[in-house]
Structures are given as C-alpha cells and as structure tokens.
From Swiss-Prot:
Binding residue positions for (6R)-5,10-methylene-5,6,7,8-tetrahydrofolate: D195, A294
Active-site residues, as the UniProt record annotates them: C167 (nucleophile)
UniProt-recorded name of the protein: Probable thymidylate synthase 225R
HAMAP family: Thymidy_synth_bact (MF_00008)
Length: 295
C-alpha cells in the first residue's frame, strides 16, 4: 500500500511535539507541549491536502474561507451557513472587551484582506482601503514574476481590537515560469501560532483552497494558472494538553490517499463563489476526533 507521505509529515510533527516538546504555560491556562520553527510542504497539482487520519470539517473550511474572502467580520453571517466555529471567540470577545456588538469579531482576517489600512468602526459599515486579494490577482495576471504578492492579516494597529489576533499572518504567492503552456501558483504561509490538533489541519486545507481559487480566477484566455505547492511555515508549534489523548490516537492511524478538488463554477469573480462550487472527490477519512477549542 502506498503511504501518503505528505500527511505523514504532519503526523511526524505531531509525534515530535508530543514526545519532544517542552511543557509550557499558556494564555488559556490549559498548558501546552511546544516546539519552535517547523515546516510542511504539500503538492497541490494532483491532490488536495485534506487530512485523512481524522475527518476534517470540510463545509467549515469552505464557508469560513468564503466568509474571509467576502471581507465579513460578522459571525452571524457564518452561522447562517451552519458554521459556528467562531462563536466561542465572539462570546468571549464581547464579554471581556465589549468594543462592538455581540456578533462583531472586530477587524479580523476578512477585513484585513479586503480593506487593509481602513479605520474599523463595526461589521455593518462600508469600507475602502487596500484590497489585497484583488491586487494579488491583478499582479498575477500582469506581472507574474513579481515577488511582492503578499496577503497580510497581521496589523499591529488593529490587533487589540480583534476577537483573536491572526494566527496565520502572512501568505506569499509565487508564480512559476510558463511550463507546457501554463504557470503554477504556489503559496507560502507563515503561521505564528500553530494549534496542531484543531487549527493546523483546517489551515492547511484553507490555504490550499485559497491557492486553487486564486489560480482559477487569475487564469485568462491566453494564460492558464494552476495550483503548484503549498508551503506551511509554523512558528510556535503546540499541542494543548487536553488534546493529547486524541492526537495519540491520530498518530496511530495510517494515512490514506488525499482527495482531489474540482472547481465547477467557471466564473472569474472571486466574490461570486458558493460552497457548491467546490467538489471534493474520493475523501475517505478515519472518524473525527473530539477536541475542545482552547480560549
């Protein structure tokens, strides 16, 4: 049987943190096992890196990413799609700071991606600012050799007003030379805080999907852009101590073949997608593992 070596690198890192990581106190009071400075790499050309050693909440991955892309910071919009992964953050943020109304997460990812530099007032307001996503798409189409295609979520001016400052902070996109009539789009993500149990599997899938979407909408009649690699740099790599039992089970599982992804909506407008446009094929994961989110 072929071993899924790409998922195996994630499992190897889990094992390293579990058995070699140092014990640390943390903001949540739960405690963690920690290592610092690791990297994973996934080939997006023929498969999609949705982990198989536990079932990953695919609907949540897609809807959260589309919510980020829309620029929304209103958790009720995500709730309407049946996704409640930000609800506890919203409740805690409102209780502790009460800066905005209860469903408002502050100037988190979507706001930074689409309205960078604007003064955040609330989730119901209209904003201008720098549309980083559209700038990246335009650059891919017009100057694919450019080395400044960066998507930034980290904003020191705004971090204190966010329900949670960005864990995945900076994504750098790179376009290859033309090979066999097409170019490849790769993404390198820097993640300052990497929760190996809950966050990282989600983040891998999310930025792999974002790379697929940007490649899709950046393609033109004369220039085909396809996904290349996803490189994931993890800075503070940690496992919460209340996740150890579940993750010990996960590393005992033999990874299966990754699924594939098809985008069936042929439009080139990044704001015009729905979750139905992304078809995941041949996803055969092990059962989900229960882990509580640390706040």
């Amino acid at each position: 049987m072929d071993i899924n070596n790409e998922e195996k690198q994630y499992l190897n890192l889990l094992e390293k943190v579990l058995f070699q990581g140092e014990d640390r106190d943390d903001r949540t009071g739960i405690g963690t096992k920690n290592v610092f400075g690791e990297q994973l790499k996934f080939n997006l050309r023929t498969s999609f890196p949705l982990l198989t050693t536990k079932k990953v909440f695919w609907k949540g991955v897609v809807e959260e990413l589309l919510w980020f892309i829309s620029g929304s910071t209103d958790v009720s919009v995500l709730n309407q799609k049946g996704v409640k992964i930000w609800n506890k953050n919203a409740e805690s943020f409102y209780t502790q700071q009460n800066l905005f109304k209860k469903n408002d997460l502050g100037p988190i990812y979507g706001f930074q991606w689409r309205h960078y530099g604007e003064n955040y007032i609330g989730c119901d307001n209209k904003y201008g600012g720098i549309d980083q996503l559209k700038n990246i798409i335009t650059t891919i189409q017009n100057e694919p050799w450019d080395r400044r295609m960066i998507l930034l979520a980290w904003n020191p001016k705004d971090n204190s007003k966010m329900a949670l400052p960005p864990c995945h902070c900076i994504a750098h996109f790179d376009v290859s030379s033309k090979i066999n009539g097409k170019r490849e789009l790769s993404c390198h993500l820097f993640q300052r805080s990497a929760d190996m149990g809950l966050g990282v599997p989600f983040n891998i899938a999310s930025y792999a999907l974002l790379t697929h979407i940007i490649a899709h909408v950046s393609s033109t009649n004369t220039e085909l852009i396809v996904p290349g690699d996803f490189v994931h740099t993890l800075s503070n790599v940690h496992i919460y101590k209340n996740h150890i039992k579940a993750l010990t089970e996960q590393i005992s599982r033999i990874p299966r073949k990754f699924p594939t992804l098809e985008i069936i909506n042929k439009n080139k407008n990044i704001d015009a997608f729905s979750s139905k446009d992304f078809v995941l094929k041949d996803y055969n994961p092990y059962p989900a593992l229960e882990m509580e989110m640390a706040l």
